[in-house]
Regions:
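Short amphipathic alpha-helical segment within the helicase RecA-like ATPase core
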Residues: 1-266, 271, 284
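Alpha-helical metal-binding/catalytic segments enriched in His/Glu/Asp
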Residues: 205, 276-287
Length: 287
């Protein structure tokens, strides 16, 4: 899904759907939600008073505009209780409304910056969380099956503050990068073991190292034995695939006071414990 940021009035955006929001137990509309409600002759306010729109976290209420707006539909996303709101909620809300609108055959959507200005949530953080949540919310591993729904092709994040476009663009790009990286890991996890072998993992690591100028080291069985990695090698004996220990590292041009290390299990074959686990937990063994 392509994401872009514009500065403008969401009521004037041409799209299959535009997304505004509402906190739980708050009947007073403000901001873009009030603007959209006015264009719809008070429809949102009426549905709130009738109890059809409640603003509960994860709730997505759909209103057809019937030509009153350039957009075909309005989605009112529930933000939950204001006192519990934060960036994790923004991510969840973005995923929820994207999944709902995909099911309604929406290919182009536009959304406001949810949560911007509330507590310590700034424009950049909001844009980042929306991008991350929407892309991860739409994730589906469809390599071996036909997708159930067509993807949303474009999402427009609509800001209102002139001069803040670059800030919001920086935010959504951060979220996009995080989501792309997470999607790659999910793809690797979801591949069957006979496809995602240690050798294939090393190939992917090599591709990443070349693309992003990372240092790559791949250790074989002999080198791991010399390092005393008996437990790892013991598990690897259950497979006909040779094990690999992969190290990817990145060093900035200038010295940094902090070093960050991420260690992943990275075992593509491990049947230990499946037979002694309750049946409802077996599905989780894949990851």
């Amino acid at each position: 899904m392509e994401i872009k940021v514009i500065i403008g009035d969401i009521t004037q955006v041409e799209a299959d759907a535009i997304v505004v929001n509402l906190f739980e137990e708050e009947e007073q509309l403000g901001g873009a939600t009030a603007d959209v409600d006015k264009a719809l002759d008070g429809t949102i306010a009426r549905l709130i008073s009738q109890g059809e729109i409640r603003g509960k976290l994860g709730e997505v209420s759909i209103i057809h505009t019937l030509g009153k707006l350039p957009a075909r539909m309005v989605a009112v996303a529930g933000l939950g209780k204001r006192e519990d709101f934060g960036l994790d909620k923004v991510r969840r809300v973005a995923g929820e409304f994207c999944r709902s609108l995909r099911k309604l055959n929406c290919h182009k959507i536009a959304t406001v910056l949810h949560g911007a200005g509330i507590d310590d949530i700034d424009l950049e953080s909001s844009a980042e969380a929306i991008a991350e949540g929407s892309l991860l919310g739409l994730y589906s591993f469809d390599k071996y099956k036909k997708p159930e729904y067509k993807d949303i092709e474009q999402m427009i994040i609509v800001g209102k503050e002139e001069g803040k476009l670059s800030v919001e663009e920086r935010g959504y790009r951060k979220g996009e990068i995080i989501a792309e990286a997470t999607g790659l890991v999910r793809d690797m996890v979801n591949e069957p073991g006979n496809s995602m072998t240690p050798t294939r993992m090393a190939e992917i690591a090599s591709e990443l190292a070349e693309r992003y100028n990372l240092k790559l080291e791949v250790f074989d069985s002999k080198e791991m034995e010399e390092m005393g990695m008996g437990a790892f090698l013991g598990v690897a004996k259950g497979s006909n695939q040779a094990p690999k220990l992969i190290s990817l590292s990145y060093k900035r041009d200038k010295d940094s006071e902090n070093a960050i290390g991420l260690i992943g299990k990275g075992v593509t074959f491990d049947s230990g414990g499946i037979s002694i686990k309750p049946s409802e937990g077996m599905g989780e063994m894949k990851t």
